[in-house]
A protein has these predicted regions:
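Non-heme di-metal
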Residues: 1-186
Length: 186
């Protein structure tokens, strides 16, 4: 079942309170919108890593759709807070300067299980980020969005953890290797 059981239309956009927006939070949300929306690059890369695993590839495709939705919703909020924010232009610049292993045909972390360890670390960190964003803002729409996205990110952590368990026996990464991968993503 997809984590995102909500749509952008369910956000209480009419409750937006511009007086509750601060510049640092706005900058963080703009950046998060770009990273989340850039999921297509991650999906393409992970699709190569898990080329022989239809189950994991389907989960990754669903994850990517949810990440893109997060980016769209965060960008919409950022444009409410800053009507001059041109998300499409910012996304073009972002993609020109940041590419995720475009030439890799296998995991850059040594194995599929290693890749899943890295994803677990990232999803855990992003869920914490969105919980902090939710708890640290007085702006009601952002609070709602951050809560929904945090919930999705916790689900994504579990999705990648379950996939890790499916791959762990075949890849046999020792404790030192798992720690190296995890610390490399912190």
């Amino acid at each position: 079942m997809p984590a995102t059981a909500w749509t952008p239309d369910q956000i209480d956009w009419h409750r937006f309170a511009p007086e509750q927006v601060d510049a640092r939070t706005l900058a963080a949300v703009k950046t998060a919108a770009l990273v989340e929306f850039n999921a297509d690059d991650y999906v393409a890369y992970l699709g190569k890593v898990f080329a022989g695993d239809a189950v994991t590839r389907a989960e990754i495709a669903q994850w990517g759709a949810e990440e893109r939705q997060h980016g769209e919703v965060l960008a919409r909020w950022a444009q409410l807070a800053d009507p001059d924010f041109d998300f499409d232009r910012a996304m073009t610049r972002f993609r020109a300067g940041y590419q995720i292993h475009p030439d890799a045909v296998a995991s850059v972390r040594g194995s599929p299980a290693g890749e899943l360890i890295a994803r677990c670390v990232v999803e855990c960190g992003t869920s914490s980020f969105y919980c902090s964003l939710r708890d640290g803002t007085g702006e009601p729409v952002l609070r709602q969005i951050a809560g929904l996205v945090a919930r999705d990110e916790f689900h994504h952590y579990r999705l990648f953890l379950d996939a890790y368990h499916r791959h762990a026996a075949a890849d046999r990464i020792g404790l030192a290797g798992r720690l190296r991968i995890a610390l490399g993503r912190v």
